[in-house]
């Protein structure tokens, strides 16, 4: 999916608002995903999945850091996310549908925390961006 210059600008501006809260939002999105889509828990059998879990917070930070890296390298996400794509495709073997579920939960989380900034245009840009990230992460499944 090709991001327009406006999409890139919207994504960068939205991610600046996320700022230091990125790890917390990542953890909240994971909690939403585990509650809304319980089958996603199967990839985390060794985690304490309770609210406020240190393990969920740690993984939420990893998710947020990966998205921050994608924002910083929006024009070359395949290179920036190559190692992460390898990990998910070859070692973890995460079902690609789970990226879509997490993307939805991330968008809901961002909308809850930044309702004024979460305009329809920003929503569309973030959705396109996260779809692009998902495409990159699943590219090595083939």
Swiss-Prot record:
Binding site for heme b: 88
GO-annotated biological processes: hydrogen peroxide catabolic process
SUPFAM superfamilies for the chain: Globin-like
Keywords: Heme, Iron, Metal-binding, Oxygen transport, Transport
Domain Globin: 2-142
InterPro entries: Globin, Globin-like_sf, Globin/Proto, Hemoglobin_a-typ, Hemoglobin_oxygen_transport, Hemoglobin_pi
Pfam families (UniProt xref): Globin (PF00042)
Tissue: Red blood cells.
Domain of life: Eukaryota
GO CC annotations, alphabetized: blood microparticle; haptoglobin-hemoglobin complex; hemoglobin complex
Binding positions for O2 per the UniProt entry: 59
GO MF terms held by the record: haptoglobin binding; heme binding; iron ion binding; organic acid binding; oxygen binding; oxygen carrier activity; peroxidase activity
CDD domains the record matches: Hb-alpha-like
Keyword Metal-binding in record: yes
Task of the protein: Involved in oxygen transport from the lung to the various peripheral tissues.
PANTHER family: HEMOGLOBIN FAMILY MEMBER (PTHR11442), HEMOGLOBIN SUBUNIT ALPHA (PTHR11442:SF48)
Subunit structure: Heterotetramer of two alpha chains and two beta chains.
Family statement drawn from the similarity comment of this UniProt entry: Belongs to the globin family.
Stated name of the protein: Hemoglobin subunit alpha-B
Source organism: Otolemur crassicaudatus (Brown greater galago)
